[in-house]
Design a protein with these regions (language model features):
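Short, surface-exposed polybasic/aromatic micro-patch for ligand or macromolecular engagement
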Residues: 1-21, 196
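Short, leucine-enriched amphipathic alpha-helices that occur as contiguous helical runs
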Residues: 92, 135, 146-148, 233, ...
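N-terminal core-binding DNA-recognition domain of tyrosine site-specific recombinases/integrases
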Residues: 20, 32-113, 124, 231-235, ...
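C-terminal catalytic core of tyrosine-transesterase DNA break-rejoin enzymes
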Residues: 105, 148, 152, 156, ...
Length: 308
């Protein structure tokens, strides 16, 4: 690897002698301008934050042709000193790599040094979710009406937390116990269209979950337009962690309820098309995300057949 990097460095210096000057900061400006027109606001905001917070402060004044593998490697090592998670480091690397790939295609950058260094960081593969018996223990210790309503909604519907935060009273039909998903919410762009066209859907939930939601509504003196935005996400996550610890169950994030719901349906052998429709995903996305559940199910079926 070291010999390859040195050779690559020498090749870089030879190629960049007559190249026009462009700093990484200048590249970032035009790259993000293009990125903004082709991506959703949330994706743009996250990419911009990655670039301005973790790339430009150390490398912004450099000519893009001077970004050799050695420099990229030093930057990657610097990230390790910041105490960031592996998934965050992966995101910073991916944003940087994508920007340089764009520069190769549109700005005449000779080569992308990430082809030598690779992208560092890892994505957490293990999904945190609750077994059904854990959910019952957790639900028993939830005392706050807002938390009770939100967590029951998330567990029994599998909707995304952003979709829950975008719900209005009109989106909930308590006669049929049906929730209509037609929008989502995030702290960057506020209310916006759902993640994909598959995300537009109607989801039926148990009557008991609806009862908790109605009780929460009744507790408000004046019902907000978006009731589930009553608490900020950080507070919701902190409350959930506290409840999980108190109940002695797996500590999950609010998104973990979505994984819990999907895993529960898979283990009850609900058809995958129905699961995908309920989650607002494609069948391929369900298989990719929850393949471990299907493998476990296959093992259980094989063990059952051995007894025949």
């Amino acid at each position: 690897m070291k010999r390859e990097a040195i050779a690559y460095e020498a090749e870089y210096k030879e190629k960049v002698k007559d190249r026009p000057q462009m700093t990484l900061s200048q590249l970032a400006e035009i790259y993000l301008e293009d990125y903004k027109t082709n991506r959703k606001p949330t994706s743009y905001a996250l990419t911009k934050q990655n670039i301005y917070s973790y790339i430009l402060p150390t490398l912004g004044n450099m000519n893009i042709e001077e970004l050799s593998p050695i420099i990229i490697k030093k930057w990657q090592n610097h990230l390790l000193t910041l105490g960031r998670s592996q998934s965050s480091i992966k995101a910073y690397n991916t944003s940087f790599n994508s920007m340089l790939n764009w520069a190769v295609k549109y700005c005449g950058l000779s080569q992308n040094p990430f082809k030598v260094t690779g992208v560092t960081g890892t994505i957490r593969k293990r999904l945190e979710f609750l077994e059904e018996n854990e959910w019952k223990k957790l639900n028993d210790v939830i005392s706050d009406k807002f938390d009770k309503a939100l967590f029951n909604l998330l567990f029994f519907s599998g909707i995304r937390i952003g979709e829950a935060r975008a719900l209005t009273k009109d989106d909930m039909d308590f006669t049929t116990n049906t929730i209509t998903i037609s929008k989502t919410h995030n702290l960057v762009s506020g209310i916006s269209s759902p993640k994909t066209k598959n995300s537009y859907r109607k989801v039926v939930i148990p009557e008991q979950a609806c009862k908790y939601i109605k009780e929460m509504f009744d507790a408000f003196y004046t019902l907000p337009e978006y009731p589930f935005q009553f608490r900020i996400p950080r507070t919701v996550a902190a409350h959930l962690k506290s409840y999980c610890i108190k109940a002695g169950v797996t500590v999950i994030t609010p998104h973990g309820f979505r994984h819990s719901h999907a895993s529960m349906l898979i283990r009850r052998q609900v058809p995958i098309n129905a699961i995908a429709s309920r989650l607002g995903d494609t069948v391929a996305e369900v298989l990719r995300t929850y393949s471990h559940c299907y493998k476990e199910q296959d093992s259980e079926i094989a063990a059952l057949l051995e007894t025949i």
